Every structure is written in C-alpha cells, then in structure tokens.
Amino acid sequence: MGGASNQPTQCETKFWITPLTHIRLTMPAVVSVERLGQGPMPTDSPFLFAVHHLDTYPAGDAKMAPAASLRGHNMGADFGHADGWSMYHGEEVPGFPKHPHRGFETVTIARRGYVDHTDSLGNGGRFGGGDVQWMTAGAGISHAEMFPLLDQAKPNVLDLFQIWLNLPKKNKMAPPTFKMMWAETIPRASPQVCPG
C-alpha cells in the first residue's frame, strides 16, 4: 500500500511458520512503509481503504459504554479522538452501528480490545486479541461493529486494523459471506531478512 518510489527487488525469503516447519517464497521487498497513526492510510488498487484505530477508552460501565464524560465528543460522528478515543458513530457504546456495504470485502484485525459483530446474514459474536474477520459484502450486507468496554476497573485499549478490498467486476454481486479466523488457528510467519 502507498506509492512506490523504487521498483521492488526480488529475494528468496525463508519463513518459519508454526505449526508447520518452514517454506521458501520468492517475493518482492517492501515497496513503501507508512507511519502508523490514527485514521485512514494511503492505498493503491485493489485496496479501497485501510484504517488503523488506536483508542484508549476509559473504564466501561454496566452497559459497556464509557464510564466518563462525553463532553468534547461529537456524538454520532465522533472522529476527533478527544481524550485519546472516539465514539465514531456510536451513541452509547463506541463503534459503527448497523450500516450497509456492497461490492467489496472487509478484513478486520482486532489486535487488542473487542469487536461485537452482528449482520443481516444472522451472524453475531465477539472477537479480539488477534482474531481476524473476513466479510465479503458482494451483493449486499448490513452489519454493525461495536467496541464494548468490558473492563470496569481500568482503561480499555482498542487496537484495530480494517482493510477494504475491491472485488473484481465479475464478483461484485457474489453472495455475501462472513468468516472468522481465530488467533490461535492463524499460522505465524517469522521471515529471515534477505541479504542486503
């Protein structure tokens, strides 16, 4: 993602993947690196949108909402990061209440904190701690992504990436699907650095 200033070089990289032993891949070197920050990042096709949310929410209350003043937060459209966190489109619990998507896929990686997902296919559940959700909107899906504040004694950190991938024209009206990849089942890769 991001604009490339140089052509990538090729090298053979050995990846150690657990629980497998190892594989060898020939792949391009990193094309560009973007500073990790709050909000959208530059993208190139087929990436439509990539965003990083890093919020340090206050302790939660019994409704999983912030047990703190909402003064300075633009309720319903809060992206200002006042006090180190945003409510986004949430009115009580932070997050994104029910909204539609069509013609693309979303990949959501919840590194820390939790996401409560519900959708028009009847799926629902909570994920976090390294879990990955892959949703194909295709012909259309409505879903909600809310960030419950479960800890009532200390701050609730949310560290989340979401990437939107454009579907090719022939797949834009594909049936919508939803898949979870739980952290403990995702192989981990540790690359050896190519000689430079």
Give the residues covered by each predicted segment.
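Generic beta-strand structural signal
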Residues: 105, 125, 131-133, 143, ...
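Low-complexity, intrinsically disordered or signal/transmembrane-proximal segments
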Residues: 7-10
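A short beta-strand-loop-beta hairpin characteristic of the jelly-roll/cupin
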Residues: 107-129, 138, 142-144
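N-terminal, Lys/Arg-enriched amphipathic/low-complexity engagement segments
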Residues: 12-109
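Short, conserved beta-strand element in jelly-roll/cupin
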Residues: 100-115, 134, 164-168
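Ligand-binding loop in jelly-roll beta-barrel domains
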Residues: 137-170
